[in-house]
Amino acid sequence: PDASGKLVGFDIELCRAVAAAVLGDADKVKTTKMNLPTSFGALQAGEVDIITHRFTWTFSRDVGTGMNYTRVMVWDGQGFLVRKSLGVKSLTELGGATFCLASGSTTEANAADYFRTHNMDFKSVTFSDMKAAAQAYNAGRCDVYSTDKFGLGARRLTFDDPSEHVILPEV
């Protein structure tokens, strides 16, 4: 929100554009905060009309949920954030590490796939959403926080000392 409490940013502006086009008034927007698992169900149940958030497009979500995805709006990849003090330079050095992840997310599935493919162990510590996972990482509950790379950069700025965290080069 801005100083007056009005929501700002890409997602809310997209909502306002849809409201203007469909309802003739950009201010006829009612927002509801939800996490990934509840938002898809709410859309399918007709509790909300659209979801605007940086959800990862996957083929199974596109064809298996009965929902219509728009075009991809941001092209990104999964990233990994670690504390500089670990001295880690690559994802390949994270065998046995603990990861703070959002439960049920593509981030969780991708991490599991990567470590299984590379015959490496890791421990997944899951949370209800990305914000909770980031807060747990910042509090020292995990070695690694993972989400989309552009999200990592933004989230890192909210940490106690952003300069103490580094985004690994792998995507």
Residues covered by each model-derived region:
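Acidic, polar ligand-binding/catalytic clefts
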Residues: 6, 16, 20, 24, ...
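Short, hydrophobic alpha-helical packing/hinge segments within bilobed ligand-binding/sensory domains
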Residues: 14-15, 38-43, 133-136, 142, ...
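Short loop->beta-strand "edge-of-pocket" segments that line small-molecule binding or catalytic clefts
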Residues: 1, 8, 92-108
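Short, well-ordered beta-strand segments
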Residues: 1, 51, 81, 98-102, ...
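Short beta-strand-to-loop elements that line the ligand-binding cleft
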Residues: 26-35, 101, 120-130
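Conserved functional loop/turn residues at catalytic and ligand-binding sites
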Residues: 47, 98, 141
